[in-house]
A protein has these predicted regions:
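Small-molecule-sensing regulatory modules
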Residues: 1-37, 43, 62, 68, ...
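Short, high-confidence coil segments that cap the C-terminus of an alpha-helix
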Residues: 52-55, 164, 252, 364, ...
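Hydrophobic alpha-helical packing residues
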Residues: 7, 11-15, 129, 136, ...
């Protein structure tokens, strides 16, 4: 609404009578992570008022307007562009950072490498922008991306709540709130850094307010252009949008490009950047110029499926994680993925869900996801139950959060919990009890967490969302010095029922899995070790201490 008030104020100063008509966009009516599902969702609802004749002009942030848009609508003009940089806000005192207000009121920028050096390993970064996601993850693939939606004030509150270690916001929005003294309580204590535009070019049109009108009324409303339009902004934003269009871009295309004094430069993420990230492979940003030329990325090395067989022992894993396997192989650990469980969604069990958008958004239900497969099922069910995609998704840990990201529906919250008890405690400590919880579970899972949350005052809807069944497997490539990773109690049972060989050492995920293993006679002479922390990092540390 600030943008509309800014335009209205300038017209009123020129003696024009103005009536402001507020419109809720479809983008405003979602807290889900899939911001790119509908290109232009922040614009369409407003411009529909133009097409219906209810308003004469419509006001937007230029970066939200698709380059291929309704040809019945034209750009009437741009206000003078504000700051174009992005600012990263931290939940901690990052080395070299300053208080947010000090950063806003200065012109000091930091190169991206300096900023990345301050960000914790495995930290959570909050942004729904594919440009910001891909640019950050191209340098730090250990980081977990989370979707932080809503107004700038809401995103800052999420940071203050400790949901993420950092959020990335447009300087223009922060600058406006600072001028209005409207930053949330506690913002004065937030540390931040401005990201250098040399390393981090802006979204096309960022920092610019654009005015739309009907194409057939351009002549009639030309006086508005004369009173409002800033020619320099029109030229720079127009060039940035031209380059974006030449790249086939929109909200779904991770492009950063900035035009200054006729010179354009920027970067674009490769088409498969999301797949590379979730698979544990690195990817490089592609430089672009005013011609929109994007050199093809070099063929990236794909780890051998078996890793490096020169070592005397290997890891045999029931956790069929491509990312973990690739990461460990790149560290020189031979990995054989040997899943012994079949998982399949049970579509008919998923309940109908219709979101009541009239209730406050901080009371909207939250979908709780306890495994990567639960996130995969939820992503599939969004097609059947669209309102699931509008609410926040809470992932038990980084693996589940990355699975959400892989399937195009980033989680909004990552509990960093190692088991259901830790997840239960996280929910009790961080989620208000008036928020309804939706919890799909496995056919072999119990309802203990759901019942405990009900006892704590939550309204919980839990159902069997996917089938867990034993997979028939033949495997005889195990040596005594090899290491077996068992990911769940059901995997332990299936390994036993398949009568598969057992090495001297078993690594497992969670105390419940360890208890199940110790109850199986086949594992009686085996050392069982519970991994502590993120799985890949824990295995890497254990391997370096015990197998090298």
């Amino acid at each position: 609404m600030w943008q509309t008030n800014e335009v209205a104020g300038k017209l009123i100063d020129e003696g024009t009578e103005v009536e402001i008509i507020g419109v809720k966009s479809t983008g405003d009516l979602s807290l889900g992570g899939n911001l790119s599902a509908d290109v232009g969702q922040f614009v369409k609802s407003v411009d529909e008022k133009l097409l219906s004749g209810e308003v004469d002009i419509a006001i937007h942030s230029s970066k939200d307007v698709p380059v291929d848009y309704d040809n019945r609508i034209s750009i009437l003009g741009y206000l003078e562009r504000g700051p174009t940089s992005d600012i990263i806000l931290f939940s901690y005192k990052a080395e070299g950072s300053k208080k947010l207000n000090e950063v806003i009121n200065s012109s000091v920028s930091h190169d991206l490498e300096t900023i990345l050096d301050t960000f914790p390993k495995g930290g959570r970064i909050g942004t729904s922008s594919v440009r910001r996601q891909s640019f950050f993850l191209s340098k730090r693939d250990d980081v977990v991306p989370l979707a932080i939606r809503g107004r700038v004030e809401t995103r800052i509150e999420r940071l203050l709540q400790g949901r993420v270690e950092g959020i990335i916001l447009a300087e223009a929005g922060l600058h406006r709130l600072s001028l209005l003294d409207a930053l949330p309580k506690g913002s004065s204590e937030i540390n931040a850094m401005r990201i250098s535009s040399e390393d981090w070019p802006t979204a096309p049109g960022q920092g610019a307010i654009v005015v739309h009108c009907l194409k057939d009324r351009l002549g009639e409303l030309s006086w508005v252009n004369k009173r409002l339009n800033d020619y320099s902004t029109e030229v720079s934003v127009g060039e940035e949008r031209r380059i974006l269009q030449s790249l086939g871009g929109g909200c779904k295309t991770p492009v950063g490009v900035e035009c200054v004094n006729g010179e354009s430069r920027g970067y674009m993420a490769p088409e498969n950047w999301r797949e590379e990230y979730v698979s544990g492979n690195s990817f490089q940003l592609l430089p672009i110029d005013k011609y929109g030329i994007t050199p093809q990325p070099e063929n990236q090395a794909v780890p051998d499926d078996r890793g490096n067989p020169g070592h005397s022992s290997k890891l045999v894993s029931t956790l069929n994680s491509e990312r973990m396997g690739n990461k460990l192989r790149n560290m020189g650990i031979e990995v054989l993925n040997t899943p012994v469980i079949e998982l399949s969604e049970i579509k008919n069990n998923w309940p109908e869900f219709h979101l009541d958008v009239t209730i406050p958004r901080n009371e909207w239900p939250i979908l709780i996801l306890t495994s990567p497969f639960a996130s995969r099922c939820a992503s599939m069910m969004v097609e059947e139950i669209p309102d699931l995609g509008k609410i926040q998704w809470l992932a038990i840990g980084s693996g589940t959060a990355r699975s959400c990201f892989r399937h195009g529906n980033p989680a909004s919250i990552c509990a960093n919990a190692s088991n259901s008890k830790e997840l239960e405690n996280y929910i009790k400590e961080n989620i208000p009890s008036n928020v309804n919880l939706l919890i799909p579970r496995s056919s072999v899972g119990n309802n203990n967490m759901a019942n405990n949350l009900k006892t704590a005052g939550f309204t919980v809807n839990s159902w069997v969302g996917y089938e867990n069944s034993r997979k028939n497997v033949e495997f005889d490539e195990m040596n005594a010095q090899d290491v077996l990773l068992i990911s769940s109690p059901s995997s332990a049972k299936s390994w036993d029922s398949n009568q598969l060989p057992v090495p001297d050492t078993v690594l497992c995920m969670g105390l419940t899995t360890k208890t199940e293993i110790q109850n199986i006679e086949r594992f009686n002479n085996t050392e069982v070790i519970v991994l502590d922390g993120p799985v890949t990092e824990s295995i890497s540390q254990w391997w370096s201490e015990n197998r090298k």
